[in-house]
Each structure stands twice: as C-alpha cells, then as structure tokens.
Amino acid sequence: MAGGAGWSGAPAALLRSVRRLREVFEVCGRDPDGFLRVERVAALGLRFGQGEEVEKLVKYLDPNDLGRINFKDFCRGVFAMKGCEELLKDVLSVESAGTLPCAPEIPDCVEQGSEVTGPTFADGELIPREPGFFPEDEEEAMTLAPPEGPQELYTDSPMESTQSLEGSVGSPAEKDGGLGGLFLPEDKSLVHTPSMTTSDLSTHSTTSLISNEEQFEDYGEGDDVDCAPSSPCPDDETRTNVYSDLGSSVSSSAGQTPRKMRHVYNSELLDVYCSQCCKKINLLNDLEARLKNLKANSPNRKISSTAFGRQLMHSSNFSSSNGSTEDLFRDSIDSCDNDITEKVSFLEKKVTELENDSLTNGDLKSKLKQENTQLVHRVHELEEMVKDQETTAEQALEEEARRHREAYGKLEREKATEVELLNARVQQLEEENTELRTTVTRLKSQTEKLDEERQRMSDRLEDTSLRLKDEMDLYKRMMDKLRQNRLEFQKEREATQELIEDLRKELEHLQMYKLDCERPGRGRSASSGLGEFNARAREVELEHEVKRLKQENYKLRDQNDDLNGQILSLSLYEAKNLFAAQTKAQSLAAEIDTASRDELMEALKEQEEINFRLRQYMDKIILAILDHNPSILEIKH
C-alpha cells in the first residue's frame, strides 16, 4: 500500500504542475478563442532570453508552424523541453477532452468479473469452500491420468488462479456487483476490510488441514466464500509452507519450497496508461475463456493427485504409529498396482510444479492487485480532474451564456431603437406625403381656377383686341379725316390769307381814296382817320394772335399723334409678351403632375404675376378707351 500511496502522489503533483501551467498560459495573454499567439510568446521570450533560446522555445511550443498555440500544445512543449513528455498523456487527454480514457473498458471488466464462478482468492491465495482444501477445478487439473490431453490441462491450471482475480477483488458486499465498487469513488469505504477475517480464515483452513487429514478428500464444487480484496496477505507463507509440507511428506526427495518474495516498486515507475488497462482487460477475458473451456473439457468427480498423495501420507503415518509396517505394505501391494512408485514420482513432480506455479501466480496476483490499486487511484484522480474540468466548463459556459445574453440584449435594444427611429421616419414621411397630396390637390384646384380665369381673360382679351382693332380702324379713319381737315383748313387758311391780303389791299386803296376824298374838310377827317388807324392796328394784332394759336394747335396735335402711336406700340408689345406667358402657363398645367413642389410654387408665383400684369394692361386699355371713345364700351342691345 505504500507503493500505491506514492504513486497517487505523483499524478497529484503532475496535476498541480498542469494547473500552474494553465495559470502561466492565462498570464501570457491568450486570445478569447483560447489560443496563444506565437508572436506574443516570442515577444515575451525576447524580454527574458536570447534569440536562439526563443526560437527553440517556439519550435517546441508550435512544431507545426500554425501560428497559434493551444493549452495542450503548450503543456506538451514544456514537458518535452523537460524530457518528460510521456507523463502528460493521460492528464492532457482529460484536460482537453474532459472524459476518462479507460472509462469504456472498466465496466466490461467489472461485468466479466461478476460472471466468473470459479474459485475465489484472498490476497493471492485460494480459500477452501468445503472441508476439502483444494477446489474441484484444481483437483481436476491435477488428476493422475486425464484422458483428454493432460499437457493442455497442466498448462491451463496455473493460469486458472490468475483468471479468478476478477471475482476475488471485492468486499463481501460486492459479491453481486463484481468489481463495480472498486472503481467508483463512493465505494472507497468498502475496499479495505479488516485483515482479521482473512487471517482467521487462513488459520482455520490450515488447522483443519493438519488436524483432519484423514477426512481430506474431494467433494466437488461448493459455495463460494467471499473474501476481502485489499487486506494484507498474512497466510501466503502459511499456504506455501503447507504445499511444501505436502510435497515433502509424499517423497523425501522434494525439497523445501522457497518463500514468496515481496517486491516494493517505486511509485513513479508504476504509471499505468489506458493501453495497459486494455491489455490487462484483454488478458482477463482470455483467462476467463480458457477457464470456461477447462471446465467444459474436465471429467467430473476424479480423484486428484494431491488427494491421492495425502491418502498415501496418511496411511504411512498411521502405519508407522502403529508399528505394523509389514501389514501396511501388504495392504498397499494388495490394493495398488505395480506402478504406484512411478505414479508417486509423477505426483511429486506435479506437486512441485504446482507449488512453483502457485508462487508465480501469487506474485502475478500481487502485482495485478498493486496495478489495480494504482488504476483505482488513477481513476479517482481522473474523476477529480473531470469534475474540475466540468466545473470549469460550466463556469465558462455560464460566462459565455451571460456574455451572449448581454450581447443579445444590447442587439435587441439597438434593434428596438432603430425600429423606433424608422417608425418615426416612416410616420414623418407619411405626414409629408399626406401634406404633399393635399398641396397637390389644392394646387390642382388653383390651377383649374387659374385656367378658368385665364380662359375668361383670354376671352376678354380677344374681345378687347377686336375692339382695339375697331378702335384702330376708327383711329385711322379719324386720322385720315383729320389730315383731310388739315388740308382743307390749310386751303381755307391760304384762301383766307389771300382774301385778307386782298381785303387789306382793298382797305388801303379805300383808305387812300377816303383820304383823297376828305382833304377839303380836314378837321372832321382827322378824328375818323385815327379811329380807322386804331381799328386797323387791332385787326392786325388779332390776325397775328390767330396765326400763333393755329401754330400751337398744330404742334399739340402732332405731339398727341406721336404719343398715341407710342402708347399703341407699347400696348401691342406688352400684349404679345402676355400671350407668350399665357402659352407657358398652358404647358405648366400639363407638367403639374410630374413637377416638384418647389417648381409648382415658383410656376404659381409666375402665373400670378402674369395675371396681375394682364389686369393692369386691361385696365390701361379700358382707361384709354374711356378717354378717347367711351361709346365703344357701351352695351348695345
């Protein structure tokens, strides 16, 4: 048990080293994905070492040049630099996979151990099941003359004790459960039983052998006796000595059997891996098959060589105590065949071989028990590692789930905010669309009204144009008439001027005649002459005033004609511009469905300005008509 305790301490130290390496791996700054970058390791290495050492370190940690290092490669590289890479196989497999490497094989071994119905063992030795010392299977293996291949039976019988290990390792409470309690941590209390049970049982078996030799014979197969699996082996030497005593009592040539040697192994050299577990399980399965074959091929109720030898020894002791040796030989000669000596020699050899095989099997069973104990400790350590890994994985899973929940909540909040913004934007666009539709409807109604007003204005403008045309014709006729009147007036004026000139000359002639006639009476004629002179002067002034007024009248008429021509030309030019703008308004009415809001507003303002100018133009025309010829605007029925 000291070796097992030492062995269990080594993986614990190894696990502590792995946990420290985990802390170093975390401190080196691993990424969130669980990998450590080679550049990071190289940078840290250059702070504490040289270039060649850093390159060697990187080569150990990243032999495949992947550019990143996981924890398994990190541990393997560190242990490879230390020269103990093999010690890390099981630990890394548990660290990385989180499962027991040999877990699938152990239940099979347990079930097989529970099915074996052969002889039972306690600490490497056989426990008697009946008053007889040897079980029926060993007695069948040691039969003097078996008819079915004695060499095969002799070869299988030593391995029979090894096969029975599956059924022997267990507590009394584990008879129905096989080896299940041995590999489970909750059954540790059942592994170790008091050593007094096995010691008392061994002492009782030895005592019954010595005191009741005359009653020792084979009675076949009996009930199995449960034995403690992990108790010490105090009766190994006793049973070995019993075998030796039996051999020496049959023949004096049989020497003392050597004592069983106990080997203490170093716990660090007993590391058992999964491959060895598989080998041991395969070996146990093979031994179980061979045991079943041996039972099937062995004859029933045959007297074994050991029983026969013990009968001879009992007869010899009994005859020597009574002093009747001759009667004993006489009875032996009568009861036995002539070849009894050869059979006794053959039995001596077989007993010696069986003793040696028993010692070998005892050593093998001790080693297997020790390895089994180591495997149990190993399983317990691996279970603890699995629990640690499960706890770590659960914590990591909870942390990851919490991060994902936080990220999901953040995304949900962002999504809700974005949806609210989009809904507000959609609502705003819907309001703008509704407003634009209302504006378009209003603009359409205004455009229709403007079209109607434009149509009315066009009709009025057409009527006014017709009237203006009539007025222009009338104006032309009036101008022609005015010219004719001017010509007639000029002719009349010239005629009047000539008439005035003739009258002046006639007046002068009459004045001269009058003067001549009045010369005889000068007193009276002086006053009349002065009156005539004044009348003549006044007439001349009036004539000059008439001429001046006529000239001013001519000038005013010319100016009036010029102004009327200018007004007419300006009115015609403005009318042309307004008609062109009206044509543009008609094209705008066709484009109102495809135009934008700003364009519609600008076109509407321009149309209103054109309408205002048209109103002013019509007002001017009406005022001009009222000034010149109001009769045109009269309504004629």
Swiss-Prot record:
It comes from the Eukaryota. Residues 280-617 form a coiled coil. It comes from Homo sapiens. Homodimer. Forms a complex with Rab11 (RAB11A or RAB11B) and ARF6. Interacts with RAB11A; the interaction is direct. Forms a heterooligomeric complex with RAB11FIP2, RAB11FIP3 and RAB11FIP5. Interacts with ECPAS. (Microbial infection) Interacts with human cytomegalovirus/HHV-5 protein gM/UL100. Ca(2+) binds at residues 62, 64, 68, 73. Residues 49-84 form the EF-hand domain. This is Rab11 family-interacting protein 4. Present at high level in testis (at protein level). Weakly expressed in other tissues. The gene is RAB11FIP4. The RBD-FIP domain mediates the interaction with Rab11 (RAB11A or RAB11B). Residues 138-175, 219-256 are annotated as: Disordered. One of its GO terms (biological process) is regulation of cytokinesis. It is found in: Endosome; Cytoplasm, Cytoskeleton, Spindle; Cytoplasm, Cytoskeleton, Microtubule organizing center, Centrosome; Recycling endosome membrane. GO terms for molecular function: calcium ion binding; protein homodimerization activity; small GTPase binding. One of its GO terms (cellular component) is intracellular membrane-bounded organelle. Keywords: Calcium, Coiled coil, Cytoplasm, Cytoplasmic vesicle, Cytoskeleton, Endosome, Host-virus interaction, Membrane, Metal-binding, Transport. The keyword Calcium applies. Acts as a regulator of endocytic traffic by participating in membrane delivery. Required for the abscission step in cytokinesis, possibly by acting as an 'address tag' delivering recycling endosome membranes to the cleavage furrow during late cytokinesis. In case of infection by HCMV (human cytomegalovirus), may participate in egress of the virus out of nucleus; this function is independent of ARF6. PROSITE patterns: EF_HAND_2, FIP_RBD. Residues 82-637 are annotated as: Necessary for interaction with RAB11A, subcellular location, homo- or heterooligomerization. It is a peripheral membrane protein. Residues 574-636 form the FIP-RBD domain. Its main location: other. Gene3D superfamilies: 1.20.5.2440, EF-hand (1.10.238.10).
